[in-house]
């Protein structure tokens, strides 16, 4: 029982710390991703990821890249704690019941990743709603000058609750789970495979310590692959989440959004922002997982 408590504390501390570190560094790239993805094909003011970054800095200032960050900093600590706790315990649950072979299988890594995301999403989805509303505010205000202007993260949360209720904060929960559940499942499946392959090449046991460059490389590759594969789902999710319930609903769900986007904008719309998504997710995941593994290795003898 004591070991379980110690393990839980280890996963919570290392998960929370690693998540905050990565989000602090990668938030500006996420702002660019959100701005690019909400633009319709043929009506874009940005010519690509780096053009969007330059225009935002030029027209709105560097500080705009950190729009929505206060809510991210507040939410990422408990969200990442739940996320890594869910992943580690899901793997352990399978190992305890079906043996180490099943515990280290790809299907277990995928399933544990999905469970981890489902737990983290209880906090991440409201955070995402607030963050993305702030990130795209300049664009949406041009379309509807009469809508409420959010003065910051906590003001946005208050207004959303007042105007849309708790459902407003969980708008797009299922699309978010349908996007990030598979993403995290694919991510951990690829990451664990990379880790075991590298360990084998270095003649190490899978659970042995790997040097930081290998952890970063595995995390980056897994993140880039998973981000590219799930980009169409992310476009749909983002379009749904930035809608306000007080406005006309263009997108009424995942399937309706898919049909509407395909009909009005064509297949190209589903890869909008892929570059920004990869450059937000891949380095962010590399930083998160490498710092998580490092902190877990350092703290395990202290807790």
From Swiss-Prot:
Protein location: Mitochondrion inner membrane
Segments passing through the bilayer: 9-29, 68-88, 110-130, 172-192, 216-236, 269-289
Organism expressing this protein natively: Dictyostelium discoideum
Mitochondrial intermembrane side: 1-8, 89-109, 193-215, 290-303
A GO CC term attached to the entry: mitochondrial inner membrane
Mitochondrial matrix topological domain: 30-67, 131-171, 237-268
Gene3D superfamilies: Mitochondrial carrier domain (1.50.40.10)
Membrane topology field: Multi-pass membrane protein
Protein name as annotated: Mitochondrial substrate carrier family protein E
Example of a GO MF term: iron ion transmembrane transporter activity
Function in brief: Mitochondrial solute carriers shuttle metabolites, nucleotides, and cofactors through the mitochondrial inner membrane.
Family note: Belongs to the mitochondrial carrier (TC 2.A.29) family.
UniProt keyword terms in alphabetical order: Membrane, Mitochondrion, Mitochondrion inner membrane, Repeat, Transmembrane, Transmembrane helix, Transport
Pfam family, one: Mito_carr
Repeat positions for Solcar: 6-93, 104-197, 210-298
Transferase keyword on record: no
Tagged with keyword Transport: yes
């Amino acid at each position: 029982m004591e070991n379980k408590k110690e393990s839980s504390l280890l996963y919570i501390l290392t998960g929370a710390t690693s998540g905050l570190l990565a989000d602090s560094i990668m938030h500006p790239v996420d702002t660019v991703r959100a701005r690019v993805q909400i633009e319709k094909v043929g009506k874009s003011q940005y010519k690509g990821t780096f053009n969007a970054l330059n225009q935002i800095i030029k027209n709105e200032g560097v500080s705009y890249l950190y729009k929505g960050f206060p809510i991210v900093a507040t939410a990422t600590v408990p969200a990442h704690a739940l996320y890594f706790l869910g992943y580690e315990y899901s793997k352990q649950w399978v190992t305890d019941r079906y043996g180490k072979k099943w515990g280290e299988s790809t299907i277990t890594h995928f399933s544990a990743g999905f469970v981890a995301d489902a737990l983290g999403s209880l906090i991440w989805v409201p955070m995402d709603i607030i963050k993305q509303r702030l990130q795209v505010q300049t664009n949406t205000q041009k379309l509807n000058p009469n809508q409420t202007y959010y003065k910051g993260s906590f003001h946005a949360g208050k207004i959303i609750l007042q105007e849309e209720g708790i459902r407003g904060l969980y708008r797009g929960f299922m699309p978010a789970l349908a996007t990030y559940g598979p993403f995290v499942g694919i991510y951990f499946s690829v990451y664990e495979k990379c880790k075991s392959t590298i360990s084998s090449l270095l003649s190490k046991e899978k659970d042995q310590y790997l040097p930081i460059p290998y952890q970063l490389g595995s995390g980056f590759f897994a993140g880039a692959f998973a981000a590219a594969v799930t980009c169409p789902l992310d476009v749909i999710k983002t379009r749904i989440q930035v809608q306000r319930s007080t406005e006309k609903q263009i997108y009424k769900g995942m399937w309706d959004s898919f049909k509407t986007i395909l009909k009005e904008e064509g297949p190209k719309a589903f890869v909008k922002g892929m570059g920004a998504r990869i450059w937000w997710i891949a380095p962010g995941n590399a930083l998160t997982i490498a710092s998580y593994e490092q902190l877990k290795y350092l703290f395990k003898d202290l807790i």
